[in-house]
């Protein structure tokens, strides 16, 4: 089968003779229909040393076979999507960029009827990042039926409720983060480019701020928070670079234990702010590797992942979560490596690059 794998240190190529993966306990064998690209994909290629490791994390497809021990109600023929662990040196056959893949059942969803393969393929990494960042780390309450009216219409965000800062609000993770924070009863304050203000507001941000305004934007956030009458104690940074960490730290209110959560290893420079970095791959509950580094399994994170994806299934079925804007790539798996170069060169903005397989 076709697959994008490591061929030498820091290099990857599309091959045409990759064997089908072996299905493991708790896993599904899936025929891939679409894949979406993330920065973590090209970063894994850069650090991978061994040949034969499959890349890619986001996909959608059709179940071909259900492995032993699967208790999640999947059957052959089901349309599914979710999160797989591409670039994993401990399990080289895990990954998304192939015609057939294996996917841990606990971290997958049945694709709702109203959703296309391409839309569903955008979810995996972002959904997992939201679960770990907003809920496991920043301790937002899980969305519940109380966040909607009896007639099914969403309640508007209450301007008097507790604010949360989402930096990088137009990224795939940020777009989802706005929506989930709103469903959890928080008031999302979105930081992004002005080109994406309308998107952030449409998804539920109560206010939007231009990251390029720096200190002026920080002052605007502080003024807005004072008007709300609630301190800003939680910030989620989907960009996770020194300037974004500093921005978040400057914007957070003083006292009462302010928290900063990031997707990459980054620390808020303010000493009174608790900084936490999440690594999405811990939700698999298995030992894993990235390049030459190795990481232990986390049973706690695996249980969070299982519970979180079950809730996400319900919210998607109810149509309460919108996917990110799709940027259609060309060439199927043949086009993926070029797409990853586009990501690396910061040529993809305000949407998710998706390839039909």
Swiss-Prot record:
GO terms for molecular function: nucleotide binding; oxidoreductase activity, acting on NAD(P)H. Its EC number is 1.-.-.-. The keyword Lyase does not apply. The keyword Phosphoprotein does not apply. Pathway: Antifungal biosynthesis. NADP(+) binds at residue 211. Keywords: NADP, Nucleotide-binding, Oxidoreductase. Belongs to the zinc-containing alcohol dehydrogenase family. Trans-enoyl reductase; part of the gene cluster that mediates the biosynthesis of the tetrahydropyranyl antifungal agent restricticin that acts as an inhibitor of CYP51 and blocks the ergosterol biosynthesis. The highly reducing polyketide synthase resH, the short chain dehydrogenase resG, the cyclase resF, the FAD-dependent monooxygenase resA and the enoylreductase resD are required to generate the first stable intermediate desmethylrestrictinol. PANTHER family: HYPOTHETICAL OXIDOREDUCTASE (EUROFUNG) (PTHR45348), ZINC-TYPE ALCOHOL DEHYDROGENASE-LIKE PROTEIN C2E1P3.01 (PTHR45348:SF2). This is Trans-enoyl reductase resD. It comes from Aspergillus sclerotiorum. The gene is resD.
């Amino acid at each position: 089968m076709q697959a994008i794998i490591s061929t030498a240190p820091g290099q990857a190529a599309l091959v045409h003779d990759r064997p089908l993966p072996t299905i493991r306990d708790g896993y599904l064998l899936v025929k891939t229909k679409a894949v979406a690209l993330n920065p973590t994909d090209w970063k894994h290629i850069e650090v991978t040393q061994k040949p034969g490791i499959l890349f890619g994390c986001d996909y959608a497809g059709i179940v071909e076979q259900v492995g032993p021990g699967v208790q999640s109600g999947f059957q052959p023929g089901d349309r599914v999507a979710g999160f797989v662990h591409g670039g994993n040196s401990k399990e080289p056959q895990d990954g998304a960029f192939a015609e057939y893949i294996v996917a841990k059942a606990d971290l997958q969803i049945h694709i709702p009827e109203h959703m296309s393969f391409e839309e569903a393929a955008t979810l995996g990494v972002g959904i997992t990042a939201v679960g770990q960042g907003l809920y496991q780390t920043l301790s937002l309450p899980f969305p519940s039926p109380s966040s909607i009216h009896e007639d099914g219409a969403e309640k508007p965000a209450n301007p008097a409720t507790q604010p949360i800062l989402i930096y990088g609000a137009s990224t795939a993770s940020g777009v989802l983060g706005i929506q989930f924070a709103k469903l959890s009863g928080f008031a999302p304050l979105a930081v992004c480019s002005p080109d994406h203000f309308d998107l952030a507001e449409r998804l539920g941000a109560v206010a939007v701020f231009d990251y390029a305004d720096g200190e002026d934007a920080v002052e605007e956030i502080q003024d807005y928070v004072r008007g709300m009458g609630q301190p800003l104690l939680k910030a989620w940074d989907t960009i996770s670079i020194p300037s974004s960490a500093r921005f978040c730290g400057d914007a957070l209110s003083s006292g009462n234990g302010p928290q900063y959560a990031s997707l990459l290893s980054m620390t808020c420079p303010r000493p009174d702010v608790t900084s936490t970095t999440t690594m999405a791959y811990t939700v698999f509950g298995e030992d894993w590797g990235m390049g030459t580094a190795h990481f232990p399994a986390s049973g706690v994170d695996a249980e969070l992942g299982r519970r979180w994806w079950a809730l996400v299934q319900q919210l998607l079925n109810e149509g309460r979560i919108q996917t990110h804007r799709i940027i259609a790539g060309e060439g199927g798996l043949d086009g993926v490596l070029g797409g990853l170069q586009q990501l690396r060169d910061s040529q993809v903005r305000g949407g998710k690059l998706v390839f039909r397989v």
